[in-house]
């Protein structure tokens, strides 16, 4: 049983905490918050030991009547690994100023740059490369989703060229500061977007073979990808079969009512998923087509949750708990109640 510390109990951190708590080979020894908000109070109510991420703010929790066990410095030495859930750029600072200082292994999230850690993690592609490493970046929700679909395609044909248009959600549901509300925004306006190089950080063999562009649209539910991949040769049946065999990919039919991201989220609600999380990505079966060996398909990504099981697998890889990535994936999925 390994000890996991969650530094930053926010959108990602609280989900990773719940996922780790469901595993039988790891436990959450504590979570941190920078301020005494409702998430901090709920963490304590759920049974997590709460620590102040910033020592100077410990008194704020006490004044708010939220029990704290101490500060980050009081618990970090007990951790075998830290999962950093801090906002963009803060993760890198934590890595340099906290985790390396204390000599503790750490996972930073996809908001940081590839060069900030020893490698970039995806359960299907880079598990072995990250095995036993000390500092790893868990790639973003979009990159995670693309890595899964590229894995499926690559399992039946060589990828010659990949072109992806990303239609990104404007903000998470709890975000009142980000937009747009009434616009479509090229983000970035230049091509390629950062997503292609980010995929290459996980799949080096796609260097020079992947091109991405991205726009932001006024929705909060999910991202969507329109994928076009030139291959060495395949057909629709092979791709459908490959998607069915690839972990954490669901193939859904518009003919059964899955005609929008709203319906996919409703499906997650009906499954009883906490926070309506869909850790699996969803590919519309009707969108899958192959013309002259070029694969076309559309997929939806729940931006708050598809990276969560990857964090659990990354813990196992870095702490050398399981050498077989597929066994770790299966173990994680079963504990979290994933469909596949």
Curated annotation (Swiss-Prot):
One of its GO terms (cellular component) is cytoplasm. HAMAP family: G3P_dehdrog_arch (MF_00559). It is found in: Cytoplasm. Homotetramer. D-glyceraldehyde 3-phosphate binds at residues 140-142, 195-196. GO terms for biological process: glycolytic process; lysine biosynthetic process via diaminopimelate. Pathway: Carbohydrate degradation; glycolysis; pyruvate from D-glyceraldehyde 3-phosphate: step 1/5. Its main location: cytoplasm. CDD domains: GAPDH_II_C (cd18127), GAPDH_II_N (cd02278). It catalyses: D-glyceraldehyde 3-phosphate + phosphate + NADP(+) = (2R)-3-phospho-glyceroyl phosphate + NADPH + H(+); D-glyceraldehyde 3-phosphate + phosphate + NAD(+) = (2R)-3-phospho-glyceroyl phosphate + NADH + H(+). This is Glyceraldehyde-3-phosphate dehydrogenase. Belongs to the glyceraldehyde-3-phosphate dehydrogenase family. NAD(+) binds at residues 11-12, 111, 169, 303. Keywords: Cytoplasm, Glycolysis, NAD, NADP, Oxidoreductase. The gene is gap. GO terms for molecular function: 4-hydroxy-tetrahydrodipicolinate reductase; glyceraldehyde-3-phosphate dehydrogenase (NAD+) (phosphorylating) activity; glyceraldehyde-3-phosphate dehydrogenase (NADP+) (phosphorylating) activity; NAD binding; NADP binding. InterPro entries: DapB_N (IPR000846), GlycerAld/Erythrose_P_DH (IPR020831), GlycerAld_3-P_DH_AS (IPR020830), GlycerAld_3-P_DH_cat (IPR020829), GlycerAld_3-P_DH_NAD(P)-bd (IPR020828), Glyceraldehyde-3-P_DH_2_arc (IPR006436), NAD(P)-bd_dom_sf (IPR036291). It is an enzyme of class 1 (oxidoreductase). The active site is at residue 141.
